Swiss-Prot record:
PROSITE patterns: UREASE_1, UREASE_3
This enzyme's EC code(s): 3.5.1.5
Residues annotated as transmembrane: none
Top EC group: hydrolase
Family: In the C-terminal section; belongs to the metallo-dependent hydrolases superfamily. Urease alpha subunit family.
Summary of subunit composition and partner proteins: Homohexamer. Other oligomeric forms may exist depending on pH and presence of salts.
Binding site for Ni(2+) 2: K490, H519, H545
Catalytic residues of the enzyme: H593
Cellular compartments per GO CC: urease complex
Keyword Transferase part of the UniProt annotation: no
Gene: JBURE-II
Origin superkingdom: Eukaryota
Protein name per Swiss-Prot or TrEMBL: Urease 2
Tissue specificity note: Expressed in flower buds and young developing seeds.
């Protein structure tokens, strides 16, 4: 066929579109991805017919689907579709704005070329149901004053040129086009008093009166036409006016120009204020505004905003971050940021704030106000945007710390793509590939295997940690795997999780300051849960899948969540309890643990692990902070790409069931949001001794960041930043004239190629391995760091998830009682972050 790469990409788009047509033909309302695929692929088909113009194709795209043919969230998720098609006169971009604009679509046209039957409109429900708007911004009432407390002046301006002139908000007004005539002396040190990034356009012959305000910061003028270069003072003003006259720039004195100071008083003529909704549309929500997270019922309210209204650093044509304006001149690379993320909403366990994020040398250098200190107030000293600074526009977007999955079976390397594309940037676990041992346990047993796993993942843009096998009652072998690079040890019943093995493993871990992860004895062979707790002997331990469906003492392993020395986590297939949770688990367990349905004892072993009552209790324990971490158990009773989505599904279910979580009121869910994000960011970092490097959006940590559209939050990120560089991102047609035409896929970027993956990431090992020089011995390019400060941890050290409830479990009914109250939680039939977003 001699196909080009772009043709192969369009075939995948066609396949998705045809799948959507089949679903539409049988009366299924389409989700976001299906709607995009159907409309884009139909445009390509009509283009191939060769009879339609670009304008006609745009029109067709607006009439294929209506609100009744798509899920209720889709009209809010889908506001534009772009695709590049080969027409008889070459490749052209077709853009469809607001493609879901009518009550019903033209279904015959939507199924054109498919030869599928056209369904009756009666098959599609009326679209009158109440529904949430995914990612909606809920603005507080009122207006925001721009540039308060500044000297201001109104000046008359005339365009004597024969072409239009457009002037941006932060352009030094004295420096503008010579064909604009006005009092340039009074404009010295001034700029337009308009919203940052806006502009004023002067058509030929236009007469306009403009409101100017003084520049801020150090008041140093750079750039423009080099009329007034230097600090704002009387001597430089006089020199600038001499240049104005000599170079014949338009100048006319306006002696009676109105001058004053901007205030917060709406009646002050110099005051510029804009409605909060308009502000949010330009720069994202500010303090007091709220965001819905994805299609959940979780509402985040902005607690703090570092922006100075009117001085936001905005990138784009005619915007703020340009030479001498928002971008400084004269600050070399050492003094300026490598990258700035502008005006992002940060959701972290530390708070929900609006700020610029500065990145330098792969680290989070600063969080606050970025820009040009020569003309802007409040720019942080280490947040200078210079000539050597790259920009990622964060307006209207959410930034979180890269997720940490601390229960990973390294069964296949392809799972790592699923991890990073979902927002996971650090993985901890064990395995050697698709061996039976690795399918069941997170252990990398042999020193040679530890070396190989560190080497084989060296170029992958993720932070890695590998755990050795801890199931041994003699210390020597454990010391050897730790020296080979194990950053932790794993006790697992499939290898033996006896009191003797537990005691020995913890004793060795104490010597090396590494964590011990445990999957306890489901069948109670050596004792009950109380005997295992006794073997802990007060020592710190991380209990995997602490509810028990993933493994552990039946039926009451969940009682470990009462213990101060136990750091409990969950795996995501039980997060949260749904009407299908119990039914799917039995076969998972049979496969993972080499069990045989024909052996009654094997069947009983698996069945004993799956208890709806304890899974229901697990939901509530997460909500009260009794379980501290959510992880995956990747490909071994867990899904590596769904750690984040399952966390937010659990939070949403608990809000619906239990109402606001103290200290939240009825207006926001900030405390619950911070509690739940801690479960896959800071808490797994603390437990594994790596929190000084990763786990939160805090200064000094690795710039592992995830950028989300609010409407897709928790389901599909836009950009994953690894060590300060973009590793994965939503990207459209690689042959496209712009980066947004379909098919838009989550794709690896330059941060994954060549030596970048190792340069941007860390391999975590034991201090013993670091001291032995495994980086050089193994030829690793990754930065290698030792884990630390884990052996003294208690649950009280974990963030926002450190409650110590008293838990009992009835051995007959499996009813879980917490602090004297029996727990119950409904098995739900629907969850957010599911069918609105995913084709399969």
């Amino acid at each position: 066929m001699k196909l080009s790469p772009r043709e192969v990409e369009k075939i995948s788009l066609h396949n998705a579109g045809f799948l959507a047509q089949k679903r539409l033909a049988r009366g299924v309302r389409l989700n976001y991805s299906e709607s995009v695929a159907l409309i884009a692929s139909q445009i390509l088909e009509h283009a191939r017919d060769g009879e339609k113009t670009v304008a006609q194709l745009m029109s067709i795209g607006k009439h294929l689907l209506g609100r009744r043919q798509v899920l209720p969230a889709v009209p809010h998720l889908l506001n534009i579709i772009q695709v590049e098609a080969t027409l008889p006169n070459g490749t052209k971009l077709v853009t469809v704005h607001d493609p879901i604009a009518n009550e019903n679509g033209d279904l015959e046209e939507a199924l054109y070329g498919s030869f599928l039957p056209v369904p009756s409109l009666d098959k599609f429900a009326e679209s009158k149901e109440e529904h949430k708007i995914p990612g909606e911004i809920i603005c507080a009432d009122g207006r925001l004053t721009l540039n308060p407390g500044r000297k201001a002046v109104f000046l008359k301006v005339v365009n004597h040129g024969d072409r239009p002139i457009q002037v941006g908000s932060h352009y030094h007004f004295i420096e503008v086009n010579p064909y604009l005539t006005f009092d340039r002396r009074k404009a010295y040190g001034m700029r337009l008093n308009i919203a940052a990034g806006d502009s004023v356009r002067f058509e030929p012959g236009d007469h306009k009166t403009v409101n100017l305000v003084s520049i801020g910061g150090n008041k140093i003028i750079r750039g423009g036409n080099a009329i007034a270069d230097g600090p704002v003072n009387e001597a430089n003003c006089k020199a600038a006016m001499e240049i104005v006259c000599r170079r014949e720039f338009g100048h006319k004195e306006e002696e009676d120009a109105s001058e004053g100071v901007t205030t917060g008083d709406p009646d002050c003529p110099f005051t510029k204020a804009i409605p909060r909704e308009e502000y949010a549309n330009k720069y994202g929500p500010t303090i007091g505004d709220k965001i819905r997270l994805g299609d959940t019922d979780l509402i985040a309210e902005i607690e703090k905003d570092f922006a100075l209204y009117g001085d936001e650093s905005v990138f784009g044509g005619g915007k703020v971050i340009r030479d001498g304006m928002g971008q400084s001149s004269g600050h070399p690379p050492a003094m300026s940021l490598d990258t700035v993320i502008t005006s992002a909403v940060i959701i972290d366990y530390t708070g929900i704030i609006k700020a610029d994020i500065g990145i330098k040398d792969g680290l989070i250098a600063s969080i606050g106000k970025a820009g040009n200190p020569d003309i802007m107030n409040g720019v942080f000293p280490n947040m200078i945007i210079g000539v050597n600074t790259e920009v990622i526009c964060g307006e209207g977007l959410i930034v979180t710390a890269g997720g940490i999955d601390c229960h990973v079976h390294y069964i296949c390397p392809q799972s790592l793509d699923e991890a990073i594309s979902s927002g996971i940037t650090t993985v901890v676990g064990g395995g050697t590939g698709p061996t039976d041992g690795s399918r069941a346990t997170t252990c990398t047993p042999a020193p040679t295997q530890m070396k190989l796993m560190l080497q084989s993942t060296d170029d992958i843009p993720l932070n890695f940690g590998f755990t050795g096998k801890g199931s041994g009652s003699h210390p020597d072998e454990l010391h050897e795997i730790i020296k080979a690079g194990a950053m932790g040890l794993k006790l697992h019943e499939d290898w033996g999780c006896t009191p003797a093995a537990i005691d020995n493993c913890l004793a060795v871990a104490e010597q090396h300051d590494i964590q011990v992860n445990i999957h306890t004895d489901t069948v109670n062979e050596s004792g009950f849960v109380e005997h295992t707790i006794a073997a802990f002997n007060g020592r710190t331990i991380h209990t995997y899948h602490s509810e028990g469906a993933g493994g552990g003492h039946a039926p009451d392993i969940i009682k470990v969540c009462s213990m101060k020395n136990v750091l409990p986590s969950s795996t995501n297939t039980t997060r949260p309890l749904t009407s299908n949770t119990v039914d799917e688990h039995l076969d998972m367990l049979m496969v993972c643990h080499k069990l045989n349905r024909e052996i009654p004892e094997d069947l009983a072993f698996a069945s004993s692990r799956v208890r709806e009552q304890t899974i229901a209790a697990e939901d509530i324990l997460h909500d009260i902070g009794g379980i501290s971490i959510i992880s995956s158990d990747a490909q071994a009773v867990g899904r590596i790409g769904e750690v984040i989505s399952c966390t937010w599904q659990t939070a949403d279910k608990m809000k619906a069931e239990r109402g606001p979580l103290q200290p939240d009121g009825s207006d926001n869910d900030n405390f619950r949001i911070k509690r739940y994000i801690a479960k896959y960011t800071i808490n797994p970092a603390i437990v594994n001794g790596i929190s000084q490097y990763v786990g939160s959006v805090e200064v000094g940590k690795l710039a592992d960041l995830v950028i989300w559209k609010p409407s897709f939050f928790g389901a599909k990120p836009d950009i994953v930043i690894k060590g300060g560089s973009i590793a994965w991102a939503d990207m459209g047609d690689p042959n496209g004239s712009i980066p947004t035409p379909e098919p838009v896929l989550m794709r690896p970027m330059y941060g994954t190629l060549g030596k970048a993956g190792s340069a941007l990431s860390i391999a975590f090992v034991s201090k013993a391995a670091l001291d032995l020089g495994v980086k050089v011995l193994y030829g690793l390019n990754k930065r290698v760091e030792a884990v630390s400060n884990v052996r003294k941890l208690t649950k009280l050290d974990l963030k926002l998830n450190n409650s110590l409830p008293e838990i009992t479990v009835c051995p007959e009914t499996f009813t879980v009682t917490v602090d004297g109250q029996a727990l119950s939680s409904e098995a739900v039939t629907t969850l957010p972050l599911s069918q609105n977003y995913f084709i399969f």
